[in-house]
């Protein structure tokens, strides 16, 4: 299977890196397009992906497509690729574009809306799948395995995507701030900054693992 990325910004790029790092796919099986040519060159050099000249070029070369563009341009992108979409699976990470919106824009297509998060870069991501989608059983199984290679997958009802996405999507930023605050307090009391970060990070990591494995109330 060949995976294509239409847009390789922060989140889509994180997914791309995670999939290659996990061994789920080789870099030479990945195709990408982004309006930032320097970004594309970096992925070509560092991860060995194929650089495409347009969104249509990505579609023509791939079986699975990760739609990773900004919400304000997604409809423009869809108008460009509509004529070349055949049986390719669209996995959308675009906020605000769920099953109903894709049914309106690309009726008859195979599409799934998901909400990933940045810890996917270190294979500890959380990805939410919208329950309503148009994938076949086999396609959904493949996409689930894809994202399980970079973390955990939860299939949830459509109405839960906003709250779930806010928690798992924005949550890491709050955790980073908490780690920074813990480290700042330690530095204020005499610890070197590097050691303070290590202690704070491991403390949060260990605490999270305790909650998951013991299932005790935090």
Please describe what each predicted stretch is:
Residues 1, 28, 49, 88-89, ...:
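A structural micro-motif
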Residues 1-46, 50-53, 60, 125, ...:
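NAD(P)+-binding Rossmann beta1-loop-alpha1 motif at the extreme N-terminus of oxidoreductases
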Residues 3-5, 65, 91, 143:
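Hydrophobic packing within well-folded, soluble alpha/beta domains
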Residues 13, 17-21, 45, 79, ...:
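Short, well-ordered alpha-helices that flank and scaffold nucleotide-derived cofactor binding pockets
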Residues 37, 47, 55-129, 133:
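Rossmann-like NAD(P)(H) cofactor-binding subdomain of soluble oxidoreductases
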Residues 101, 105-110, 126-164, 175-213:
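Internal alpha-helical scaffold of NAD(P)-dependent oxidoreductase catalytic cores
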Residues 171:
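Aromatic-residue-lined binding/catalytic grooves and analogous aromatic/hydrophobic interfacial grooves
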């Amino acid at each position: 299977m060949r995976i294509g990325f239409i847009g390789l910004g922060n989140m889509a790029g994180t997914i791309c890196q995670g999939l290659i790092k996990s061994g789920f796919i080789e870099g030479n099986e990945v195709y990408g397009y982004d309006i930032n040519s320097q970004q594309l060159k970096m992925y070509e050099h560092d991860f060995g992906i194929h650089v495409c000249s347009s969104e249509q070029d990505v579609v023509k070369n791939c079986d699975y497509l990760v739609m990773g563009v900004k919400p304000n341009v997604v409809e423009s992108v869809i108008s460009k690729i509509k004529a070349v979409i055949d049986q390719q699976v669209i996995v959308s990470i675009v906020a605000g574009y769920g099953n109903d919106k894709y049914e309106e824009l690309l009726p008859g297509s195979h599409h799934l809306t998901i909400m990933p998060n940045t810890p996917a870069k270190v294979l500890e991501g959380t990805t939410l799948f919208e329950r309503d989608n148009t994938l076949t059983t086999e396609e959904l199984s493949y996409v689930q395995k894809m994202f399980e290679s970079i973390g955990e997958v939860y299939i949830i009802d459509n109405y839960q995507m906003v709250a779930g996405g806010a928690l798992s999507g924005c949550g890491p930023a709050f955790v980073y701030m908490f780690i920074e605050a813990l480290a700042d307090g330690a530095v204020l009391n005499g610890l070197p900054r590097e050691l303070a970060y290590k202690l704070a990070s491991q403390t949060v990591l260990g605490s999270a693992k305790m909650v998951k494995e013991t299932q005790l109330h935090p």
